[in-house]
Amino acid sequence: MTVLLALDGVACIRGDRLVFEELSLALNRGDALWVRGPNGAGKSSLIRLAAGLLRPAAGRVVRRGRIALIDEAAALDSELPLRRALDFWARVDTVDGHAVDRAMDMMALNTLADVPVAMLSTGQRRRAAMVRVIASGAPIWLLDEPANGMDQAATARLVAAIATHRANGGAVLLASHFALAIPDLDELVMGVLA
């Protein structure tokens, strides 16, 4: 097995609060891990640590391959039409337009290509964020509440995209308050430390 993402004895401190400690995990090609727990348990902090946006207070994080991240913000220019906003990130991520086309089709956003990002619903913005993740070609997906605002059909598309990514050898670390119908999903339950 090829490990794409590993955390070894990781601790996270935010402000003066210990969020979690001695956390270890490994994601191999084809793996998916659902991180769940109450608000404040450290789900988003774990995603940010895995992405390299936070430094662990202890332990180490090893990434083998590029990452693609969804967090609370879609990071799309709200004034641009959706397709132009996605094309900007495609250039940053050095992805060709065909990958964006395929990802937009996968997330059923082609009909919204000319709509300004500011006019999209929350669920549509989450789907747009998934387009960027899918098109990136990154083997490691870090998804923080990716289904927020999505209806049942959009959630099914998200689940299908995750399944395709895993079948192609990718790994997914998914933080979510609610379960998604993803087969063979490992689970990490995080709690609040006293």
From Swiss-Prot:
Cell compartment(s), UniProt: Cell inner membrane
Quaternary structure, from the entry: The complex is composed of two ATP-binding proteins (CcmA) and two transmembrane proteins (CcmB).
EC number: 7.6.2.5
Gene Ontology MF annotations: ABC-type heme transporter activity; ATP binding; ATP hydrolysis activity
PANTHER family: ABC TRANSPORTER I FAMILY MEMBER 1
Domain of life: Bacteria
Location of the ABC transporter domain: 5-194
Disulfide bridge map: none
Catalytic activity: heme b(in) + ATP + H2O = heme b(out) + ADP + phosphate + H(+)
GO BP, one annotated term: cytochrome complex assembly
Lineage: Bacteria, Pseudomonadati, Pseudomonadota, Alphaproteobacteria, Sphingomonadales
Keyword tags: ATP-binding, Cell inner membrane, Cell membrane, Cytochrome c-type biogenesis, Membrane, Nucleotide-binding, Translocase, Transport
Listed name of the protein: Cytochrome c biogenesis ATP-binding export protein CcmA
Stored Pfam families: ABC_tran
Membrane topology: Peripheral membrane protein
Its biological purpose: Part of the ABC transporter complex CcmAB involved in the biogenesis of c-type cytochromes; once thought to export heme, this seems not to be the case, but its exact role is uncertain. Responsible for energy coupling to the transport system.
Binding site for ATP: G37, P38, N39, G40, A41, G42, K43, S44
Entry annotated with the keyword Membrane: yes
Annotated Gene Ontology cellular component terms: plasma membrane
Family indicated by similarity: Belongs to the ABC transporter superfamily. CcmA exporter (TC 3.A.1.107) family.
